[in-house]
Amino acid sequence: MNNLRQRTLTGLGWTGATRLLGQILQLAATVVLARLLSPKEYGLLGMVLVFTGFATYVADMGLGASIIQRSTVSDRHLNSVFWLNVAAGTLLTGLFALAAPLVASFYDEPQLRMLTVVIALNFVFGSLNVVQIALLDKSLNFRTKFWIETVSSLASGIVALTLALAGAGVWSLVGQSLTQTIVRVLMLWAQSSWRPALAFDLSAIRELLHFSGHLLGFGAVIYWSQNIDKLIIGRWIGSSALGIYSLADKLMRLPLYNVTDVTTSVMFPALSTIQDDVEAVRRAYLRAVRMISLITFPMMTALSVLAAPAVLVVYGSKWQASIVILQLLCFSGMAQSIYNTAGWLYLSQGRTDVLFRLGLYSTTVRVTGVLIGAHWGLMGVAWAYVIGGYVFILYPTWSRAGRLVNLSFTSLLRNVEGPFACATTMGAVLWASDRWIFGGWALDARLAIQVALGVIIYAILVRTFRLQAWVEVVHILLARSGGRSRFLRWAAGHEA
């Protein structure tokens, strides 16, 4: 157990560093690209990605996750998964090439025809690394993954900026996507000793599909739950509106990607190794949820309160329409950071059948809400997303997962109430100071001082009230420093 805990913490560190640095590199590229490109050009790519993103779930078929979850896998499984994914990727590329005119017609955007054909090449390239990624994650070898993601993000950003400066418009975003996929594949193959043999065993696929079949179904339905808003905006409101909405959505998801997704990539394989020890799973799960809420709640709160200076400083005045959308989506993001973790329990316990049914339910809620909200434009869609997440999805999704490990919804709320209270207090102080003290300051100075103020206030609050998650994080860092850090001893409430 101690070895697993150590490997999990190491994995969290490397995965966190991977995602953080990757997001910093991508954010830096996006800051420049947003000033060079228009909302319409971002919206055009977003229209295509709605469909290709869905096909990405289908191409993987959940088999990569099945390799991670299965206690033992043989070359028979690995070879079969590899060749099936290559076949699926090639087929999807061909299908999208044929369907490109239909995509362009659906949105009434002729430019989408060639964009769809080129972006679909990602399926062929991406199918070559499914097994290698699964083996890396299964072995908790996140240090190697760090370098792969860092180099691929850096290379793709350079390509995108070069194309944008050359006047390539939306094609600079396409080049960024393809470059990242290709570089990632090359580096994964370079580091992996596993090579596919010319062998395929249908029975091996059937063994894996027992787990991945429902997971594939869940991935498909939850994808539309998370992206139906973009499809409807692109079809009925327009590409410029989709560009505005997509940028706000991307900013909101930065904390989610850097915290929740990072933790998920480590917690799923870690919990799978102790799936038969319900008490151990429950303890590990609650510890992770506490840490997630400790980080995501203040980030979402601060981003919502400081949305105006953040958008105007980082992206420029032509993206001003995304400010209010960002504020609403951040409110939804706090709930997402918690109910998304329910998937760890379903996956680690092998209950993808229940996960699939809940995915159908949440997708129905999202589709219904967004269709109604679209009558009031972007604001209506954003409100539908928020209301659906809190009122109809949070409790049903999580409470069923908690039963798998004898964990009540009330117990979950008790574990996140401290970070929520501290984050809300911090947000109130930031809002008041922005309104009555810093409102007239220059935007960049206003943003910088408010971010610093938010960090200080939140740190004081969590230390003063000794939140359990705060103490756990500090003790982990203190142990890793050998107890020598006076600051960490103070943060933990010990005498310096």
Give the residues covered by each predicted segment.
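N-terminal membrane topogenesis motif
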Residues: 1-27, 65-68, 72-83, 112, ...
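Interhelical loop/hinge segments that connect adjacent transmembrane helices in multipass membrane
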Residues: 1-4, 8, 143, 186-227, ...
